Amino acid sequence: MSAIIFIVETLLSLALFVVLARLLLQWTRADFRNPLCQAVVRITNPIILPLRRVLPPVGKLDTASVVAVLLIATVDVACIFALHGLGFPPALLWVRPVLTEIARTLLWTYLSAIFLYALLSLIAPGGYSPLQSVLATLCEPVLRPIRRLIPAVAGLDLSPLWAIIAIQAVLILMR
């Protein structure tokens, strides 16, 4: 039974990650001609396009992506409750676990993105790759305020380190 729980939780977490990544890429105005962005769009289109017919965007906010994130997180929490034999709580008690799951996935997404961004900048500084372009677009809105507070030391940008520490602290507090 634990193998089934692991597989279901992993698949739903990956689905939530990909749809959340699409929302973040739209929010940061990533270049959707980038091959990685195109892959995310192709993977998420079966979920997003039917919702978009019903839920048009409101300003810059893609409501279809937001609703997809909420739906997948709700299904994820429901499956976790069901597979662990906890039953289904009343609707109002779902709000906190669903929002916690979304926040946790968002934080892990940014933690991973910032780590990869810092690693790529150390391995190939000034180089270009589709991954590096997407990571820069995602990470800069988070790293820019930290850079204003903590300047580079001897040419070494420590903002990714501080961002990772802050994200880890928030993840620990969420336990």
Where are these regions (language model features)?
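Selective transmembrane helix interface/packing segments
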Residues: 1-175
